[in-house]
Amino acid sequence: MDKLIITGGHRLDGEIRISGAKNAALPILAATLLADTPVTVCNLPHLHDITTMIELFGRMGVQPVIDEKLSVEMDASSIKTLVAPYELVKTMRASILVLGPMLARFGEAEVALPGGCAIGSRPVDLHIRGLEALGAQIEMDGGYIKARAPAGGLRGGHFFFDIVSVTGTENIMMAAALASGRTVLENAAREPEVVDLANFLIGMGAQIKGAGTDTVVIEGVKRLGGGRYSVMPDRIETGTYLVAAVATRGRVKLKDTDPTILEAVLLKLEEAGAQIDTGNNWISLDMKGNRPKAVNVRTAPYPAFPTDMQAQFISMNAVAEGTGTVIETVFENRFMHVYEMNRMGARILVEGNTAIVTGVPCLKGAPVMATDLRASASLVIAGLVAEGDTLIDRIYHIDRGYECIEEKLQLLGAKIRRIPG
């Protein structure tokens, strides 16, 4: 199993490009199943979850054509089976996203209950109830979700999400695109990745209004055609490198990103003392060698502060001036990295859904273990600011969400290398 070794104490300085967003790419890949002609998806990140999704399609008979830049042409007309098997689904929660498109396009689907990061209870109930609102008949059997559309196909309906769900909104929006009649989704997720999926569907001929608000209206169409689409930049990868620069008192410029989808994070980084400049597709940040100031954050669904950034801010606060609190309202069990960071000399107290972080002058390198995707990133940041060497084990979590993380950090001057397992 690969490990990362980081020699801390070096300010980040330089420029890198940001990859396509995994959390936009996965639903967009799933949505290619809705098209009856080939679709090309560009700007895909080189990540394990992406290759797993492409492998899943291959197992189902869809033969992807991949070029050297990881643009993928998908043609769902060659599909041979409507079963998403457990051995692929178990490693990736997002595979649930094929349920809605398969059901809408082919009238049936069989998808194993998903895996992915073990963060709290992430139920699939909303997906099931939402699809039932469109007329689907669904049963759970042997660890599989087995779904059938009624005779004549799915029909438009009204569905209220009692909990905001990004993948739930995406799954039902995709299914509704080919349902007959109008579907109204209330308390829908507003994340930019949902908007990116809607724009992709609209490009194929779907009729969707309100994406990015809490009410999405879909007028079903009879068919969706192919096309070419470039996935949006990854806002969480963007935020992670910005926080790493702040924690190391450095200076970076990030290209091929979008500052408008990261406003809550940028405001907090300015509060921490960063000087930030932005353009249409770039962000520059300069700490001018200063120690960051501790900030308070509270996670909530978009457009508020993202849960996927709280672990990184805990790392920044750990070496900041003062005390900052981080309140997690989206997922439970999302402070598992704190105990590893305390072993590095951090002063972090967890009380329920709140982490109270008192900054220390510096952390000490230590062997640590990654527990989930974003926690892994926080340990990398901790390693960058620590004295001595930090060895991070179980970095397959990092590889699920960050493309070439050690190479990008090396471009910024970090002393980091991968040790093959």
Swiss-Prot record:
Its EC number is 2.5.1.7. It is an enzyme of class 2 (transferase). Signal peptide: none annotated. UDP-N-acetyl-alpha-D-glucosamine binds at residues 93, 122-126, 308, 330. It catalyses: phosphoenolpyruvate + UDP-N-acetyl-alpha-D-glucosamine = UDP-N-acetyl-3-O-(1-carboxyvinyl)-alpha-D-glucosamine + phosphate. One of its GO terms (cellular component) is cytoplasm. GO terms for molecular function: UDP-N-acetylglucosamine 1-carboxyvinyltransferase activity. Phosphoenolpyruvate binds at residues 22-23. This is UDP-N-acetylglucosamine 1-carboxyvinyltransferase. It comes from Azotobacter vinelandii (strain DJ / ATCC BAA-1303).
